[in-house]
């Protein structure tokens, strides 16, 4: 009888654990019903990019900020794999150990936004993904020096 009760308890615990694991949400599952518009000025040319925003509290906070007014960010190259600039507000963080891909839009330390044109691994929050450009095109658009990015959202 004790053996049967032990088996039942084990099965219940395994079922509960599996159910709880299935309820975990990934910050990249689902997208918000709006697009992020990005205007890039690299000093020699201007480009318009569009990105999807992931459905997480960080992206929602960014969208709320941008619904008030567009935000202009001065961005600098870092490590020859990203452009990074300070946001005018701190956003909630949902950091996870990830490896970025070209086109990823990442929240760093809650107050910096980065556009990746190469890979990097660290604890980051994914905000979204730039659409419709290759890695080579993105690298050319972002250029080798500083850029100015104007962020806005559309519904």
List where the protein language model places each region:
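Extracytoplasmic
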Residues: 31-35, 46-48, 57, 101, ...
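N-terminal secretory signal peptides
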Residues: 33-81
């Amino acid at each position: 009888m004790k053996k049967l009760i032990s088996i039942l308890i084990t099965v219940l615990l395994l079922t509960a654990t599996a159910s709880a694991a299935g309820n975990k949400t990934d910050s990249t599952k689902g997208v918000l019903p709006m697009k992020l518009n990005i205007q890039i000025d690299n000093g020699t040319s201007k480009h318009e990019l569009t990105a999807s925003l992931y459905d997480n509290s960080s992206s929602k906070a960014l969208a709320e900020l941008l619904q008030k007014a567009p935000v202009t960010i001065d961005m600098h190259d870092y490590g020859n794999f990203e452009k990074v600039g300070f946001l005018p507000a701190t956003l909630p963080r949902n950091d996870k150990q990830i490896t970025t891909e070209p086109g990823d839009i990442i929240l760093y330390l809650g107050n910096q936004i980065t556009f990746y044109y190469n890979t990097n691994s660290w604890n980051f929050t994914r905000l979204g993904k730039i659409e419709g450009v290759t890695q080579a095109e993105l690298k050319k658009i972002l250029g080798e020096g500083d850029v100015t990015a104007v962020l806005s959202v559309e519904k």
